[in-house]
Amino acid sequence: MTFLAPRTYLEWRTNGTDRAEDAAYAFGKDLIVHCRDEVLSTLAPDVPEATRAVVQAAVDTALHNVLDMLEGFWRLPSGPQHSLEYVLQVRVRDASGTIVESQEIAPCKLDLPIGYWKWARDREFR
């Protein structure tokens, strides 16, 4: 399967929203390759297609729900007077390990749950 690779850091666009989107695409590629693909690769080659489809759907639902949670789709109570919010930030480090840029991509920045399907189904990271 072919995929459209995300831009490298030096190729990120300069507009603020576009730059955050480029960071999100980098995250999306890593989520798909290191989480989704890694799990699906553990299935034996002779697993029936119906079983493979059920496992793939379960993995997609779980990862999509993580993105929903990061986007603030659900209220996450922490006692009677407080709630929680999870934040996803992409940090770029140079060769020496120094942070050169940070982009907050969730919550409520780029609609990651919609992006998930583009990443998982189309392998498109731009």
Features from the language model and the residues they span:
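N-terminal low-complexity, intrinsically disordered segments
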Residues: 1-53, 80-82
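Acidic, proline/glycine-rich low-complexity IDRs
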Residues: 2-10, 36-37, 41, 73-126
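Low-complexity, compositionally biased segments
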Residues: 21, 25, 33, 63, ...
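Mature extracytoplasmic domains of secretory-pathway proteins
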Residues: 45-68
